[in-house]
Amino acid sequence: MAERGSDIRPGHVLEHNNALYLVVKVMHTQPGKGGAYIQAEMKNLKTGAKQYERFRADGDIKRAIVDESDYQYIYGDGSMITIMHLKTYEQLTISKDILGDKSIYLQDNIIITLVFYNGEIISAKVPDYVTLQVVETEAVIKGQTVSSSAYKVAMLENNQRISVPTFIKPGDRIVVYTPDDSYYERAKG
């Protein structure tokens, strides 16, 4: 489907130079001289290579027509995971590599969104927000003030280390923002 360059958004899948690219980041630029353009950071879905491309804001781009389906994670077996379609209950076994570094968030019953192009899986996404338990944290030095650091490093149940506020302690459940692997808030309830 053809669209204008100014319509590019993160998450779109584009057909460009005979390959499929996932748009990761977009920056609109209006130079003092000449026409506006879009600087897009894209990831080649076949090779995983990152690429930067400029598109004219009023130029045409070709957006790939993709289908998305939600699947529930059932279990992992080494480098493979088994997931189940939420409506048809069909089970698939796919490579964990399709999730890239986000496979660290796999836990029982998490919902994974698979992206299909011409019936073939081209990418997968975990939810933007995942709740995890803090296993251990660094000790806070008494007298530490806001002017120094208001954060400390915490180890989560999935063996991931992230920065959390100093009031977080082992046993707390926190919400992690998965696109940038950062602390979002303490889990409610």
Curated annotation (Swiss-Prot):
One of its GO terms (molecular function) is translation elongation factor activity. Pathway: Protein biosynthesis; polypeptide chain elongation. Its main location: cytoplasm. Gene3D superfamilies: 2.30.30.30, Nucleic acid-binding proteins (2.40.50.140). It is found in: Cytoplasm. GO terms for biological process: peptide biosynthetic process. Involved in peptide bond synthesis. Stimulates efficient translation and peptide-bond synthesis on native or reconstituted 70S ribosomes in vitro. Probably functions indirectly by altering the affinity of the ribosome for aminoacyl-tRNA, thus increasing their reactivity as acceptors for peptidyl transferase. This is Elongation factor P. The gene is efp.
